[in-house]
């Protein structure tokens, strides 16, 4: 009806007409907890997703203006392997936004802004899932980031797989007995767990061969918890933490497709996520994972195992909720590029890593090989905008990572690095003056 106003509390205005900050109305005046020190100094060449370049590193120091003892605010955070970083897209250049955007991954096609990670949003807030390398005093050290130097960070939250993964968030409707109006639990009783649980998983159809799945690794899942046996060995735990630093579905759902795992990411999305049920902390203390390795028969001090059949994730059955993403996320029209270096660029990179007196050395990378792999990861994802891909194909492309200023050009299916020289312009941090960020006004 005409004249019908939106429900909700009305924002109060000052005499000058400005909206007062208030929690009730959602009009907030935020203050960054810190400013990121990143290996990327500008937007050009910065990865659009954190998983593109695992070698990208950053440091975030909590400001004493927020807490007198910043180290107190980080107490206990070192027990987590990954953290959510909530930040501001401070280099947008303008506050305006559109309902439809053209993300580079769609190569010119339009879609709704809320179905993308576009920085141009009604509230210019970004979200990154980064690997926590270490906590040192009032600072945290991160890797696998997609934020530039000087980014205002609003908040830090630990990544908890049990809460942040979409699997098992809700139970399928079939689990409810509508006749008796009683809820039937998903778990199997202890007496039947060794037989019925495995049979039911095989009948669910999860053990059918997948078209793109690698034969080197089969999907496995933790066994229904019935006892404290069948723990993973140390080598298995290390292998899983290296291959699966987070749930694959949550990674795909947030656009975190790793270039190195493209051959298996599609198959894992079709099968379902690898589902460790405990913390992904690298230390792995007090929380171990269980899995089915077949029926283990203990005889004296020796355990004989029978051949293992493929299983689907624990607690999952036909009709169970799972994470779903559009096809353009997993099968983007933008192809992965081959990256190559000219001999001159290889020589330039070697000179940057030398420890000559008076020459700057890498601040975020530990070696020239790490810098090279980071450059390869950035270029293989084609960091150019849609405009540059279509109208500036003959132009050189420049970007800076750490202290390396990279010059390259793009051809048909490849990117070639022509020159690498020390970055000339120092990166300046945003000062505390004018650091307040207004959101929701």
Swiss-Prot record:
InterPro entries linked: TrmO-like_N, UPF0066_cons_site, YaeB-like, YaeB-like_sf, YaeB_N_sf
UniProt EC number: 2.1.1.-
Catalytic function, reaction form: N(6)-L-threonylcarbamoyladenosine(37) in tRNA + S-adenosyl-L-methionine = N(6)-methyl,N(6)-L-threonylcarbamoyladenosine(37) in tRNA + S-adenosyl-L-homocysteine + H(+)
PROSITE patterns: TSAA_1, TSAA_2
Region annotated Disordered, chain positions: 179-231, 264-284
Domain spans labelled TsaA-like: 30-168
Principal EC category: transferase
Biased composition (Polar residues): 179-192
GO BP, one annotated term: tRNA methylation
Role: S-adenosyl-L-methionine-dependent methyltransferase responsible for the addition of the methyl group in the formation of N6-methyl-N6-threonylcarbamoyladenosine at position 37 (m(6)t(6)A37) of the tRNA anticodon loop of tRNA(Ser)(GCU). The methyl group of m(6)t(6)A37 may improve the efficiency of the tRNA decoding ability.
Family: Belongs to the tRNA methyltransferase O family.
Name recorded for this polypeptide: tRNA (adenine(37)-N6)-methyltransferase
Gene for this chain: TRMO
